[in-house]
From Swiss-Prot:
Name the record gives this protein: Junctophilin-2
Organism: Rattus norvegicus (Rat)
SUPFAM superfamilies: Histone H3 K4-specific methyltransferase SET7/9 N-terminal domain
Renumbered residue ranges of the record's region Disordered: 164-190, 246-273, 439-661
Motif Bipartite nuclear localization signal: chain residues: 345-359
Alphabetical list of Pfam families matching this protein: MORN
Transmembrane regions: 671-691
Compositional bias ranges of the Acidic residues kind: 573-582
SMART domains cross-referenced by the UniProt entry: MORN
Mod. after translation: Proteolytically cleaved by calpain in response to cardiac stress. The major cleavage site takes place at the C-terminus and leads to the release of the Junctophilin-2 N-terminal fragment chain (JP2NT). Phosphorylation on Ser-165, probably by PKC, affects RYR1-mediated calcium ion release, interaction with TRPC3, and skeletal muscle myotubule development.
Residues with site note (Cleavage): V155, R156, L201, L202, R565, T566
């Protein structure tokens, strides 16, 4: 057997024994471009036993076959360590995977590199799961046992399948304490959950809020509220369970918990529940699992006496089941996302109540059956676990033999080529330095944060740290809540002076949609912000105008800004009592006729001259006008004014009739609406009771 150094075209090199044109004996080989290194024994070009080191510092120590890891060996990948069997490059059939910085581990059977079959999963806080696995997830039947509540770890991740995430192979096998897992959409669960505790006395974030009239309708909201009074999520049940020292805010470490919902504001009810629960309370779940979550039939029981038997969905009570309280009382019915929505209490129809009770009994029987199967599967998993431990011990011996072969190969490579670069030890040094730096950073960051800010120590990946404790940036703009509200900009042409608005001319408060009117053009314009029906309603509320007016006074008030009579005073008739004319400039309800428009332009008063007309008391001033033009003008304008007055009188009569109709219709419409609402409520209640 000869030996030496051989350089390949891809940048790799081999230094060691050689026979028949192939690596044989002991030797050291680097991969393409010098990346990666294998040192150990060879058999005509294939690895037999040795150590492979990746550029990241990950290593495999064990046996090989046909160029793949096969047999027994130990893989160090990030902060995870696998010890056990290998089959054609994949983990399995039996093996153990554990975390180097926590107590999290899996012991059992494997298939294609994933947990598959039966095994035991132990979490960082000491909780365990024994049962079936499929494709790296808890699937089938199993038993989940938690540690005492005071020792259970707080789950801060918004999305996580397991406490230490024994599923992921990404990022060199290292999974951050709060790293997300791709398990599908999440359901809002109680805030601050604890590992292994899924019997929640709190409803979901949406159901925990008091149902309003406008969320799901007035009728459905009230009916839902009355039906769920016996639920563990109701307010009355919360108070009773607080007295019995039970708690919520808990879910399984494999469940998904959201801190964004229910963790802020005065409605955060997780703190009192966490404070009142007994620290020695434990919880056990026995039943079905689907896709790493409690789904199907199962039994969950706490050491304090709280027990649920029935159907589950995504770690929540969902379906028909029965909850037994610590004091012996029971509630049973249909659950929907942890809330009892259809119970057997206070039922109107006994037939429907019996159907619900039958479904509850079926759910309880299925849960007890599933619990018995889960206990059997847990016993099988325990036997598989003991076998996996034996394989792990054998893998440790295989790793020792592989290291011996690696040392022989390194010694031979130095003898054959002293200048040959061996990258393996350098990779491992880099990995050790990186781990030391990460550990020092994780130790320094909580010290800097804790004394300075008084905040509890949390992982830096924790979303709760960002959601609830991140202060506002100091250099940013001030909060919008602190700035005074900007004044509303007036509309074009508006004026703050009340005398320039249409309502001010008429002695009324101006409306929101009205536009200001100037003496020249405001009398004949309509406000674009109001429809014609609105103007009719507003006109109807005005005081009734006088039956007739004095044309001369109305005519000459437009010229002199006060009432003037040119002819000799005559005793006015009874229907011509002098009254102020608030309605003269307001004609915005209808488009004016050409004659009335000319009269209104002449009659529009000057600004700020609001002297009421007193024709009965004023004495006429001596005016010397030209006789013939005045008479002609007076005759023409009086004729036009009489026509306009007739039209105005007709319009005002129509407005008064509309007002009377509105007043007559208002009372019956209100009573009719109330009667319809009451009738709908009665029909809805009867319909719901008949359906359920």
């Amino acid at each position: 057997m000869s030996g030496g150094r051989f350089d390949f075209d891809d940048g790799g090199a081999y230094c060691g024994g050689w026979e028949g044109g192939k690596a044989h004996g002991h030797g050291l080989c680097t991969g393409p471009k010098g990346q990666g290194e294998y040192s150990g024994s060879w058999n005509f070009g294939f690895e037999v036993a040795g150590v492979y080191t990746w550029p990241s510092g990950n290593t495999f120590e064990g046996y090989w076959s046909q160029g793949k890891r096969h047999g027994l060996g130990i893989e160090t990948k990030g902060r995870w360590l696998y010890k056990g069997e290998w089959t054609h490059g994949f983990k399995g059939r039996y093996g153990i995977r554990q975390s180097t910085n926590s107590g999290a581990k899996y012991e059992g059977t494997w298939n294609n590199g994933l947990q598959d079959g039966y095994g035991t999963e132990t979490y960082a806080d000491g909780g365990t799961y024994q049962g079936q696995f499929t494709n790296g997830m808890r699937h089938g039947y199993g038993v989940r046992q938690s540690v005492p509540y005071g020792m259970a770890v707080v789950v801060r991740s918004p999305l996580r399948t397991s406490l230490s995430s024994l599923r992921s192979e990404h990022s060199n096998g290292t999974v951050a304490p709060d790293s997300p897992a791709a398990d599908g959409p999440t359901l809002p669960l109680p805030p601050v959950p604890r590992g292994g505790f899924a019997l929640s006395l709190l409803a979901t974030a949406e159901a925990a809020r008091p149902p309003g009239l406008f969320t799901r309708g007035a009728l459905l909201g009230r009916l839902r509220r009355s039906e769920s009074r016996t639920s563990l999520g109701s307010q009355r049940s919360r108070l009773s369970f607080l007295k019995s020292e039970l708690s919520s805010g808990a879910s399984d470490a494999a469940s998904t918990g959201s801190l964004a919902e229910g963790a802020e504001g005065p409605d955060d009810a997780a703190a009192p529940f966490d404070a009142d629960i007994d620290a020695t309370t434990t919880e056990t779940y026995m039943g079905e699992w689907k896709n790493d979550k409690r789904s199907g039939f199962g039994v969950s029981e706490r050491s304090s006496g709280l027990r649920y038997e029935g159907e589950w969905l995504d770690n929540l009570r969902h379906g028909y089941g029965r909850t037994t309280l610590p004091d012996g009382h029971r509630e049973e019915g249909k659950y929907r996302h942890n809330v009892l929505v259809k119970g057997t209490k206070r039922r109107v129809l006994p037939l429907k109540s019996n159907k619900v009770r039958q479904k509850v009994e079926h759910g309880v029987e299925g849960a007890q059956r599933a619990a018995a199967i889960a206990r059997q599967k847990a016993e099988i998993a325990a036997s598989r676990t003991s076998h996996a431990k034996a394989k792990a011990e054998a893998a440790e011996q295989a790793a020792l033999a592989a290291n011996q072969e690696s040392n022989i190969a390194r010694t031979l490579a130095k003898e054959l080529a002293p200048d040959f670069y061996q990258p393996g030890p350098e990779y491992q040094k880099r990995r050790l330095l990186q781990e030391i730096l990460e550990n020092s950073e994780s130790l320094l960051e909580p010290r800097e944060r804790g004394p300075g800010t008084g905040l509890p120590e949390r992982p830096r990946e924790s979303p709760q740290l960002h959601e609830r404790e991140t202060p506002q940036p100091e250099g940013g703009p001030p909060s919008p809540a602190g700035t005074p509200p900007q004044p509303k900009r007036p509309r074009p042409g508006s004026s703050k002076d009340g005398l320039l608005s249409p309502g001010a001319w008429n002695g009324e408060p101006g409306g929101e949609g009205s536009r200001p009117a100037t003496p020249s053009d405001g009398a004949g314009r309509r406000s674009p912000a109001r429809p014609a029906s609105e103007h009719m309603a507003i006109e109807a509320l005005q005081p009734p105008p006088a039956p007739s007016r004095e044309p001369e006074v109305a005519l000459y008030r437009g010229y002199h800004s006060y009432a003037v009579r040119t002819g000799p005073p005559e005793p006015p008739p009874l229907e011509d009592e002098p009254e102020p004319e608030p309605e003269v400039p307001r004609s915005d309800s209808e488009p004016p006729s050409p004659v009335s428009a000319t009269v209104q332009e002449e009659e529009s008063p000057a600004p700020r001259s609001r002297v009421p007309a007193k024709p009965a008391t004023l004495e006429p001033k001596p005016i010397v006008p030209k006789a013939e033009p005045k008479a002609k003008a007076r005759k023409t304008e009086a004729r036009g004014l009489s026509k306009a007055g007739a039209k105005k009188k007709g319009r005002k009569e129509v407005a008064q009739e509309a007002e009377a109709e509105v007043e007559v219709e208002e009372v019956p419409n209100t009573v009719l609406i109330c009667m319809v609402i009451l009738l709908n409520i009665g029909l809805a209640i009867l319909f719901v009771h008949l359906l359920t």
